Curated annotation (Swiss-Prot):
This fish has three hemoglobins: Hb 1, Hb 2 and Hb 3. They all have a similar Bohr effect. Residues 2-135 form the Globin domain. Involved in oxygen transport from gills to the various peripheral tissues. This is Hemoglobin subunit beta-2. It comes from the Eukaryota. Coiled coil: none annotated. Pfam families: Globin (PF00042). It comes from Somniosus microcephalus.
Amino acid sequence: VHWTAEEKALVNVVWSKTDHQAVVANALGRLFVVYPWTKTYFTKFNGKAGDSAVQTHAGKVVSALTLAYNHIDDVKPHFKHYEGFHVDPENFRLLANCLNVELGHTLHKEFTPELHAAWNKFSNVVVDALSKGYH
């Protein structure tokens, strides 16, 4: 994936202006409401963003996003350790959609079409890297 300097700067805007844990936890809460079948893998979760199990999982998602952010030019090799997990890769896409909604809600007017496009590209790279390990 080729990143322009502008795209990287826009991804940095998202990364620097958000509370990662809160955004991801809220996105997970939204995921479980909008796509209830995704709770199949999280039977002990009550599905609310403030739930300790959701917060713990949000921390894992934040760690993966941080890893991708820190290696934005070459994400896939850094996601090898996710191979062998048995999760439907489509759930990653659904979570990415929920993250976009939550970021729009969090950043309001700052979530411009350009910023949205750059973040969407980033999340697609992450989803693709994660999905490779689950096939």
